[in-house]
Regions:
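Bacterial Sec-dependent N-terminal signal peptides
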Residues: 1-44
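Charge-biased low-complexity segments
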Residues: 31-189
Length: 189
């Protein structure tokens, strides 16, 4: 009986250690992007055709947190109030950004990107208040093909382009807390 109790104690201690090791990892995984559902205000209304349309915004306390510069994020403000109403709007913005990016690259740069695999360079669209966030994501297959400085150069060139009703396209400014809601990814091939 004594041996069994001793073994039970060891098992309990081991299980406790495992749980204590896993919990911090789980917490850090959910907060890796500095944003989760509790930071987001969602407003949904029914459209005349019965379709549910939702807009998303960060809570006010996060909207004013302007923090640091990133060479991977591009902040752009659309000509309207910038509220996404449905996934189709998100997709339209994603396509617009993809087209702007392609139009600012020269043939040699497009060829360099094309040598990567499909997930070499992806475009994600998120939202912070009334501004849109466009994130240029370098995939693992792209590490040795395109440098961070190259992406920054491309983004600065994109920032000078005005197209499809989008104005005030700017780089090097974004809010630290941003929505993790992401549009469909588009690979630049």
């Amino acid at each position: 009986i004594y041996t069994n109790n001793k073994m039970k104690t060891k098992v309990y201690r081991f299980c406790l250690m495992v749980v204590m090791a896993i919990v911090p990892l789980a917490i850090s995984a959910t907060t890796a992007y500095g944003s989760n559902d509790k930071d987001i205000v969602r407003n949904c209304t029914a459209a005349p055709n019965g379709e549910k349309r939702c807009s998303y915004a960060l809570k006010k306390e996060y909207q004013a947190v302007e923090h640091r510069i990133s060479n991977k994020l591009l902040l752009l403000r659309p000509a309207d109030d910038g509220v996404f109403v449905d996934s189709e709007s998100k997709r339209a913005y994603a396509n617009t950004i993809r087209n702007i990016l392609l139009s600012t690259l020269n043939d040699a740069e497009i060829a360099v990107i094309s040598r990567g695999k499909a997930n070499c360079l992806n475009i994600k669209i998120g939202k912070d208040g009334k501004a849109l966030l466009v994130e240029m994501v370098l995939g693992e297959d792209c590490d040795n093909i395109i440098s961070q400085s190259h992406i920054k150069k491309v983004l600065k060139r994109v920032a000078r382009v005005k197209a499809n009703g989008i104005r005030d396209l700017r780089v090097n400014q974004y809010y630290d807390y941003y929505m993790s809601i992401v549009a469909t990814q588009h690979s630049v091939r």
